[in-house]
């Protein structure tokens, strides 16, 4: 009966939504806040009265985001730090510094992502390892540092941005897909541990979004576009923010992405690969690195453009 009650409650929660919680004076750490979705999320948090802590790599910085938020809130309510989140020592020092200068972090947004696009054979072991450090282990290190203070007060919220590579493996993105799939398991495991420990005041949210109209994806041209065009930053950020504010554990933007695990579950594996080949893989990569400006370079120094393949050869 308890399971039925929870299912009904979840369905009602999904259909009718609930009142958004008040996050004024919450200390929110956002990684990858210098641009893109991280910047947009930081602005939305600031508009709701949160104390926003910005974190990005030294080569990107937070100057633009800091300026935008300072025009919304008092400068004392926004703080900017630089950190290589792929470095465990730097992450540890960052959290200690924030706790000393700002206060205990009550909301963590794991948003930073380092994209690498190469086939698994063309990617070096060092590149693969660096990608996992930045995209997977950074979230683990941050949660390990921040979660104890949340548990002492039974209050907090951990948010992780996943992207579409968390729900299906995409060719030439093996490092990112590995990291994002790992984050799914990490978030589910943490949520279970919190439930077992009786920490009902600490929430988790995992957000999956379609690719966005940012510098990384502005040249994207896949067969998905007529059905699901690239999302604007404003639209994606507002949808994810609403899910956070009603404590939703998992959110997909757009909702069509909820169907992907179901489709993968009922279709033969080769059939799902044919769908991927038809809509994504054969002709054009998700983004074209060599056409981006130098300041937007990714971790991988070269862009691997997959050759056109037949459906059968790709599946065998």
Where are these regions (language model features)?
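The beta1-alpha1 cofactor-binding region of Rossmann-like NAD(H)/NADP(H)-dependent oxidoreductases
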Residues: 59-60, 81-93, 125
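Canonical Rossmann dinucleotide-binding motif of NAD(H)/NADP(H)-dependent dehydrogenases/reductases
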Residues: 13-53
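SDR active-site lid
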Residues: 193-257
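Non-catalytic terminal and boundary segments that flank Rossmann-like NAD(P)-dependent oxidoreductase
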Residues: 1-25, 274-316
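Active-site helix of classical SDR
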Residues: 143, 179
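Substrate-binding pocket helix/loop in short-chain dehydrogenase/reductase
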Residues: 119-120, 127-129
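Conserved glycine-rich Rossmann-like NAD(P)H-binding loop of the short-chain dehydrogenase/reductase
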Residues: 48-64
């Amino acid at each position: 009966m308890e399971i039925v009650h929870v299912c009904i409650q979840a369905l009602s929660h999904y259909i009718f939504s609930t009142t958004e919680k008040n996050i004024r004076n919450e200390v929110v750490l956002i990684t990858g806040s210098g641009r893109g979705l991280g910047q947009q999320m930081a602005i939305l948090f600031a508009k709701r009265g949160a104390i926003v802590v910005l974190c990005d790599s030294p080569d990107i910085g937070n100057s633009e985001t800091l300026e935008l938020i300072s025009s919304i809130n008092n400068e004392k309510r926004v703080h900017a730090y630089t950190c290589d989140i792929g470095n465990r020592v730097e992450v540890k020092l960052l959290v200690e510094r924030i706790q000393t200068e700002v206060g205990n972090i009550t909301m963590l947004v794991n948003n930073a992502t380092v994209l690498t696009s190469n086939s698994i054979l063309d990617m070096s072991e060092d590149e693969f390892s660096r990608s996992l450090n930045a995209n997977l282990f950074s979230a683990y290190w941050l949660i390990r540092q921040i979660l104890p203070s949340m548990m002492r007060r039974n209050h907090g919220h951990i948010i992780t941005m996943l992207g579409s590579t968390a729900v299906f493996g995409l060719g030439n993105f093996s490092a990112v897909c590995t990291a994002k799939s790992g984050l799914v398991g990490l978030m589910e495991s943490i949520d279970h541990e919190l439930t077992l420990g009786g920490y009902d005041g600490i929430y988790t949210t995992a957000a999956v979004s379609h690719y966005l109209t940012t510098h990384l994806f502005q040249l994207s041209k896949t067969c998905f576009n007529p059905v699901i065009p690239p999302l604007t930053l404003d639209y994606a950020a507002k949808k994810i923010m609403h899910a956070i504010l009603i404590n939703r554990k998992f959110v997909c933007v757009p909702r069509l992405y909820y169907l992907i695990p179901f489709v993968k579950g009922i279709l033969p594996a080769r059939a799902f690969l044919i769908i991927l080949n038809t809509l994504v893989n054969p002709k054009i990569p998700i983004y074209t690195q060599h056409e981006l400006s130098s300041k937007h370079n990714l971790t991988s120094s070269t862009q691997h453009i997959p050759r056109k393949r037949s459906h059968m050869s790709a599946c065998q």
